[in-house]
Design a protein with these regions (language model features):
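Non-catalytic structural scaffold of enzyme domains
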Residues: 1-192
Length: 192
């Protein structure tokens, strides 16, 4: 999830001296389930509110703090480290920042995932890429679109096929929701 993305960013040589704000929207997660309820507009609204928080200077040091701190610096870039949030809200976030006249880069994880998917291919090789993701990410079609576009631009693979499988409960399992994890399971779920 987002913490593994942050860990990779922090280890990048050119970014070692930067300060980071990690924001996990625990109140509205998992984002991957919003499309199951046909509620992607609410998902986009949550992501925009997340961005507004990151743009502001106020924050609370703890859950029981009575007054906000006001010393948070303006962010230089925003990484949306959730596939479903990237799929449904990235373009809206970019437009929001542009309309606000803010020169802040926004990066989504899907393009990075599409780039990484080609790591095991030799130039000109045919191949298939399997995407296992939340229902929302799969329904968005964002990964096949990004993979095909990347291949079209780079011409790395001769013929590429993309297969997707939505994982029921995958978002919850990633976040270690006790309802979604059965450590003693010996077969797939009956509703899968």
């Amino acid at each position: 999830g987002g913490l593994s993305v942050l860990a990779d960013i922090v280890q990048h040589e050119g970014l070692a001296r930067e300060s980071y704000i990690y924001m996990g929207d625990m109140a509205n997660m998992p984002y991957g389930s919003y499309s199951l309820e046909n509620n992607t507009e609410l998902l986009v609204e949550h992501v925009i509110k997340d961005v507004q928080f990151l743009l502001g200077n106020k924050y609370y040091r703890s859950g029981d703090a009575r007054k906000p701190q006001t010393d948070k610096k303006q962010v230089k870039a925003i990484v949306i480290a959730c596939n479903t949030a990237t799929a449904f809200a990235l373009d809206t976030v970019k437009r929001f920042l542009e309309e606000a006249g803010l020169d802040i880069g926004v990066i989504g994880v899907i393009d990075a995932g599409a780039t990484g998917a080609f790591g095991n291919f030799s130039p000109g090789e045919d191949g298939s890429i399997a995407v296992m993701a939340t229902d929302g990410t799969v329904k968005s079609g964002a990964y096949p679109e990004a993979i095909i576009l990347k291949n079209r631009n780079d011409g790395q693979v001769e013929n590429i096929r993309v297969f997707q499988q939505a994982g029921i409960g995958i978002a919850e399992a990633i976040d270690e929701s006790h309802d979604a994890i059965d450590r003693k399971a010996t077969s797939p779920r009956a509703d899968y």
